[in-house]
């Protein structure tokens, strides 16, 4: 089975700064709108279209109290998709109040938190749910209701989270692409009797030791990665409870950047996951302003072919080009190869640049190749 996606888009952004009548408040309004098109090289196995166009709107409202430390950010999101009703959806990416005093920071509302250092996968990144209809690589996330306290001390930084509500993963509908047959049901199952109202907790400690940045994290609550159960002729996502311990390490040694993410997760199954590797940067290629990063990573999951994610015994190799021009042109390309099955691999290309101060273009291309029926990508 082979699938290829090419996705191109334009981004229009504008910013307006407004000062309220009261001198102690400042308001900033900005936002973006983008036109996106996905093109597949072949029709879907269930007859889905080869093309898929959509519009995205993402305004941003920022408020800051100039005579105090309070600030509030509100970022709503909406996508209209011409083909897939399930991909047409809205979300509150952020509605977060921040205040700080001394060594302490308090955030409350809806927010996004990213943990991770590696390129090919982010094992330790467990706070936010994946907005799976948005991107193939799982980088897009839904906003997460939270209370987040940060304590910054000389001995390190600690982050404490209370997560009072769970967000279900989004999935493509019947007319959408990159889905199983039948489509995944919107009727989710939960291990906890509290379902989406289960209160989750998370903690992270981080500190710089010279050129090495080390983080240790713990999460207890509803697993963001669903299992799948066949019920009544439907594939239903099943959200189990889990505990996870994670560690992420990133260190700079000359032009080398070494990375590690390692987790142990206790959920419906118990497993260990590892992503580790390096990125070497060739600065000023042939006396030019262009920098090239050479990336290599190894991915391991102790569940083998029973893993719910890609990368149980795989290697990733890639190149990152930074052209260092005034348009901020960047290109990333890479390939992940399954070491157990030579016919299982996927490749990606990401490229972006500014047209002017208001317009930006971006292209994402993905190739999936698989002839092994028991592999997740099949």
Where are these regions (language model features)?
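Repeated loop/turn-to-beta-strand initiation elements of outer-membrane beta-barrel proteins
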Residues: 29, 67-72, 103-106, 155-158, ...
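Transmembrane beta-barrel strands of outer-membrane/channel proteins
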Residues: 31-39, 74-78, 108-110, 160-164, ...
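Detector for outer-membrane/organellar transmembrane beta-barrel domains
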Residues: 253-338
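Residues on the lipid-exposed face of transmembrane beta-strands in outer-membrane beta-barrel proteins
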Residues: 57-63, 94-99, 147-151, 203-207, ...
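Surface-exposed beta-loop-beta
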Residues: 177-273
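Outer-membrane beta-barrel translocator/channel fold
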Residues: 36-48, 83-87, 107-142, 293-316, ...
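Residues that define the transmembrane beta-barrel architecture of outer-membrane proteins
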Residues: 49-57, 88-93, 141-145, 152, ...
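Outer membrane beta-barrel
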Residues: 68-176, 210, 370
């Amino acid at each position: 089975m082979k699938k290829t996606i090419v996705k191109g888009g334009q981004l229009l952004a504008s910013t307006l700064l407004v000062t309220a009548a009261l001198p102690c408040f400042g308001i900033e309004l900005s936002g973006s709108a983008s036109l996106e098109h996905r093109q597949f090289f072949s029709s879907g196995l269930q007859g889905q279209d080869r093309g898929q166009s959509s519009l995205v709107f993402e305004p941003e409202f920022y408020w800051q109290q100039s005579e105090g430390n309070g600030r509030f950010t509100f970022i709503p999101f909406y996508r209209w998709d011409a083909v897939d009703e399930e991909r047409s959806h809205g979300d509150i990416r952020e509605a977060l109040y921040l205040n700080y005093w001394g060594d302490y920071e308090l955030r409350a509302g809806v927010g996004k938190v990213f943990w991770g250092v590696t390129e090919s996968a982010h094992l330790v990144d467990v706070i936010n749910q994946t907005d799976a209809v948005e991107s193939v690589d799982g980088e897009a996330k839904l906003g997460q209701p939270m209370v987040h306290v940060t304590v910054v001390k000389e001995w390190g930084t600690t982050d404490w989270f209370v997560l009072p509500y769970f967000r279900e993963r989004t999935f493509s509908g019947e007319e959408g692409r990159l889905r199983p047959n039948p489509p995944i049901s919107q009727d989710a199952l939960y291990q906890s009797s509290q379902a989406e109202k289960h209160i989750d907790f998370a903690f992270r400690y981080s500190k710089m030791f010279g050129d090495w940045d080390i983080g240790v994290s713990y999460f207890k609550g509803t697993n963001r990665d669903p299992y799948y159960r066949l019920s009544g002729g439907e594939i239903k996502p099943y959200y189990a409870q889990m505990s996870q311990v994670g560690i992420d390490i990133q260190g700079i040694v000359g032009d080398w950047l070494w990375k590690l993410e390692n987790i142990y997760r206790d959920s419906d199954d118990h497993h260990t996951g590892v992503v580790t590797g390096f990125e070497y940067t060739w600065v000023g290629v042939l006396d030019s302003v262009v920098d090239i990063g050479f990336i290599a990573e190894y991915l391991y999951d102790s569940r083998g072919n029973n893993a719910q994610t890609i990368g149980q015994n795989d290697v990733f190799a890639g190149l990152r080009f930074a052209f260092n021009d005034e348009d901020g042109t960047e290109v990333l390309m890479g390939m992940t190869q399954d070491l157990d099955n030579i016919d299982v691999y996927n490749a990606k290309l990401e490229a972006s640049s500014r047209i002017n101060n208001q317009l930006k273009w971006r292209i994402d291309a993905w190739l999936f190749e698989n002839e092994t029926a028991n592999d997740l990508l099949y």
